[in-house]
Design a protein with these regions (language model features):
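Subset of outer-membrane beta-barrel
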Residues: 1-253
C-alpha cells in the first residue's frame, strides 16, 4: 500500500540468544518534489568470552552494527513509482570497526483496478570504506536482486504475495536460481485486525538439521489497529534452533 501522511514506525526483533535488532523510521511528502525518509537500524549481538591462544578466558567483548539511511521516492505516473536509499553502515567487533556505504534502488508498478502490485529492487550496491584490519581484503556487501508480486483477491479479504531473492547469485542450474523465495498471505478479518502467514524457502533449507526441519521457515503474525496506531507482532520459526519475535508500532504524525 502507498504511504500517506508522515508515517513513523518503531520495530524490535528478538533474535536467537542475546541478538536484538531495533529500527526507527520516518518519512514525509514534499509537494511536487517527492517523499523523503530517514531510518536508523541497530543490531546488538550480545557479549562473547575473550580468550588467549591457550583458551584461557581473559574477559568479554561485544559486537554491534548500525545503519543510517536516507531515502527518496516519487512517481512517474499514477501507476509507476521509483525510489532509492543511501546507507552508511558501521560495524564494531571488540576494539575493531568497519564502515561501508551502500545504495538500494527500487521500482514499483501498481494496477489499482485489478489489485496487482509488482516490484523490483537491487539492494546493497556499494562497498567498504574502512576495514577491520588494514591488511585484510575488502569484504563484499550482500548484494541482493529481488522481484516480487502481490494480489488482493476480489471476493475474499485476502492479499497474496510472492518474492524471489538473491536472483543475482550463481547457482548450479536455472531452476536453483529461484530457490530463495518467500510466500505470504494477509487476511483482513476486520477493520482493526489482520492475520498474516508466510513461508521462507531459503530459511527452511538453512535451518534443516539432518533430515529434520520442523516448522523452520514458517511465519505467523497479526496486526491490530487502535485509533491512529498500528500494532504488529510476528513469529518466524527457525526449526529446532528456536525462533524470532518481531514487535512493531506505527502511526502517522
Amino acid at each position: 500500500e502507498l504511504l500517506q501522511g508522515n508515517p513513523t514506525s518503531f520495530s524490535f526483533v528478538k533474535h536467537l540468544m542475546d541478538i536484538n535488532l531495533a529500527t526507527l523510521s520516518y518519512s514525509t511528502e514534499f509537494e511536487n518534489i517527492g517523499r523523503f525518509g530517514a531510518a536508523v537500524k541497530y543490531i546488538n549481538y550480545g557479549s562473547f568470552d575473550e580468550a588467549d591462544d591457550f583458551g584461557n578466558r581473559t574477559g568479554e567483548f561485544g559486537a554491534n552494527e548500525m545503519a543510517f539511511i536516507i531515502g527518496y521516492a516519487n512517481n512517474l505516473d499514477e501507476n509507476f513509482y521509483y525510489g532509492a536509499n543511501a546507507k552508511f553502515i558501521y560495524s564494531g567487533i571488540a576494539d575493531r570497526s568497519s564502515t561501508a556505504m551502500a545504495v538500494d534502488l527500487g521500482l514499483h508498478y501498481a494496477i489499482p483496478d485489478k489489485n496487482w502490485n509488482f516490484g523490483f529492487a537491487v539492494l546493497n550496491l556499494g562497498g567498504q570504506l574502512s576495514k577491520y584490519y588494514e591488511t585484510s581484503e575488502a569484504e563484499d556487501l550482500p548484494l541482493d536482486v529481488v522481484v516480487g508480486v502481490s494480489k488482493r483477491l476480489e471476493n475474499l479479504p485476502l492479499r497474496l504475495s510472492l518474492d524471489f531473492h538473491k536472483l543475482n547469485e550463481d547457482r548450479d542450474d536455472f531452476i536453483e536460481r529461484f530457490k530463495a523465495f518467500t510466500v505470504g498471505a494477509e487476511f483482513t478479518l476486520s477493520k482493526v485486525l489482520k492475520l498474516r502467514l508466510g513461508y521462507d524457502n531459503e530459511r527452511r533449507s538453512e535451518f534443516k538439521i539432518g533430515s529434520t526441519a520442523g516448522v523452520a521457515g514458517f511465519n505467523a503474525g497479526l496486526g491490530v489497529k487502535v485509533s491512529d496506531y498500528q500494532f504488529d507482532y510476528g513469529y518466524s520459526s527457525l526449526g529446532l534452533v528456536g525462533g524470532l519475535h518481531r514487535i512493531g508500532i506505527s502511526t502517522s504524525l
